[in-house]
Amino acid sequence: MIWQEKIDAALDARRVADALRRRYPVAQGAGRWLVADDCQYLNFSSNDYLGLSHHPQIIRAWQQGAEQFGVGSGGSGHVSGYSVAHQVLEEELAEWLGYSRALLFISGFAANQAVIAAMMAKEDRIVADRLSHASLLEAASLSPSPLRRFAHNDVTHLARLLASPCPGQQLVVTEGVFSMDGDSAPLEEIQQVTQQHDGWLMVDDAHGTGVIGEQGRGSCWLQKVKPELLVVTFGKGFGVSGAAVLCSNTVADYLLQFARHLIYSTSMPPAQAQALRASLAVIRSDEGDARREKLAALITRFRAGVQDLPFTLADSWSAIQPLIVGDNSRALQLAEKLRQQGCWVTAIRPPTVPAGTARLRLTLTAAHEMQDIDRLLEVLHGNG
């Protein structure tokens, strides 16, 4: 098979399965409204959970940062790209989440890949929740360490895997809030089992940070768990982009030496770090509390109104509210019908989710109003 035949065959297989991904250019994709092709839609696809992407205080911080530092960092943090703006943000994140150190990364994907690549060796073992994010599972698959996957949130299965002989170290990997189902990991139980087998715990809390817990400190804080490695991202609750790894002083020093994604990538712009500091200030404030309370009320309203629809509603009290349809074509058709009636939703299909569980991944944000939820419910009931 020549290259073009290989590529064509892969694309054809996706088309036949109604699994071909497409991008839609939008004029505005975050916030309450999505604008595309000169049309305005209620936006139920954004991860901007607290509605901070258009917050004037955060926008102003980015603008002022650009005026002070320029629009780029100019290099890797190991050369000239580590600014005082980065340093202060790392210190504030570490203090907020109760860790000795924080290290900034350009994305959550890069952070997850970097940590696993740097930490794991051939004699070690990675034990990951089977529904962990693609960045975690891909990094584990590429690692020289063997990967074992435990059934979703099944602590008993995890314990059995950890109990089998391992010549090196064991790293347990999970998410705080799962990106496709919106449910939460039983982190306290997972940490107890991990510690019983002398392992370390790595939690990706991309969808919990900023959104749940006291001052938005996330899933681990809420469950009174402190993993050895905590990954937080800034494209969801923070409304910006980027990520950080929270850890001990010695682990941070180790990652600075061996995390190639960190060493060989241009740092995020200092202006972005300034915007993230402003976002963190909002998240920790009374306004942040009010936004989280509003989001919780919207979630309650939605779940109360969707119970009698002929779809499976995931066990989620997070901003992620998946309606599991099952069939790929049915999910695509339903998403299109909702768009025609003014609600922008996204159909998620395999391989992102398991076969037979195609879904509408609905996301609610603090930018929504109660009437927006009522409109979504009205449209769903009309197409159920």
Swiss-Prot record:
Q: Which UniProt keywords apply?
A: Biotin biosynthesis, Pyridoxal phosphate, Transferase
Enzyme class label:
transferase
Pathway in which this enzyme or protein is active = Cofactor biosynthesis; biotin biosynthesis
Annotated pyridoxal 5'-phosphate binding sites? 108-109, 179, 207, 233
The family database entries (Gene3D superfamilies) matched by this protein are listed as: Aspartate Aminotransferase, domain 1, Type I PLP-dependent aspartate aminotransferase-like (Major domain)
Q: Which SUPFAM superfamilies match?
A: PLP-dependent transferases
Answer whether the UniProt record assigns the keyword Transferase to this protein.
yes
What cofactors are annotated for this protein?
pyridoxal 5'-phosphate
Where is the chain membrane-spanning?
A: none
GO MF term set: 8-amino-7-oxononanoate synthase activity; pyridoxal phosphate binding
Which amino acid positions bind substrate, per UniProt? 21, 133, 352
Q: Which residues carry this modification: N6-(pyridoxal phosphate)lysine?
A: 236
- What reaction does this catalyse? 6-carboxyhexanoyl-[ACP] + L-alanine + H(+) = (8S)-8-amino-7-oxononanoate + holo-[ACP] + CO2
| Recorded family membership | Belongs to the class-II pyridoxal-phosphate-dependent aminotransferase family. BioF subfamily.
Give a short account of what the protein does: Catalyzes the decarboxylative condensation of pimeloyl-[acyl-carrier protein] and L-alanine to produce 8-amino-7-oxononanoate (AON), [acyl-carrier protein], and carbon dioxide.
Description of how the protein assembles with itself and partners: Homodimer.
User: Would you tell me the protein name for this molecule?
Assistant: 8-amino-7-oxononanoate synthase
Q: Which organism is it from?
A: Escherichia coli O81 (strain ED1a)
User: Which gene underlies this protein?
Assistant: bioF
